[in-house]
Amino acid sequence: GERLWYAVSNNFKENTRHLPLNSDTTGSFQVVDPSGSIIPNVIAVIIAPGPPLQRLNAGSVQDRSPGGENNPANYLDETASEDNAEFLENTSNGFISGIVRDPLGRILVNDTMTVITYDDLMRMLEKQVATTVLNCLTSYAAYNVGGINNFGRYPWAVEMSAPATPPYIDTPNTVFGRVPTLLTNTNLTAPNMLSAWGSIPSCTITHNWFQNNWREHVFYAIADAYKPGSVAPSCPMCLKVGPINNVQVVVMVGRKTLPGQNRTNKTVIANYLEGENATPYDGIFVSSAISSTFNDLLVFK
């Protein structure tokens, strides 16, 4: 078979990287399927060329000899509105998947494609981010080495009104907020508790992948019974997620911006979280299917 071709959205390419890359990063081109339906928000395509044909505005059949093998027009096809060899981001000239014929039955496009959309990637990525943060928190709570024993307790969060510039220090007496980089105030509240994540090698949330991309989108809440300085952590002083009681800690990802949310103001919870999750201090949270008014992702213990 012919060599495969690949295109990736500028927002998702590796070199140079677009920052940030998170739930609000969208694909920048579209694909038209053989029926004429548009697949929007595409982040990458893998294209398998069909047999050589004469492109719409070409004078001869595609040349796939060694001399023409690096010219995409010798492999990829076009219609009057889409050119697979010369696509443009953020325009209607994206990609078109074959088979496509003209009114006389002549094949215009015989390229076939595998499409990767925003939803294909971002749902997995968001789940990985949430799980990583939860694992950091539970590993922290379980830490017991030498004179440091966290006794099953979790660190203070960073309050919503904290500056959006480093260092991101935990805020005293804050059981809901963003993820801190430094746990200074947790250690001041309970000197036997860790003051940093560095003693947990598996925890990477202080690294650039999280700090540059996800820090503003991820939140957590801890049950009052599991806050720093509490004694003998136990329920019933715990959180609730839907019908599930006795929850110690909840991690939430504010997914793609919904209508009415304005994330230039990063201090308002409702600009990131919806429903019960936007009123976190009552200890009641909800995990539900994605809709036009709700798209929070929750993981918890």
Please provide the spans of the model-predicted regions.
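N-terminal pilin/flagellin-like segments and related low-complexity appendage regions
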Residues: E2-K301
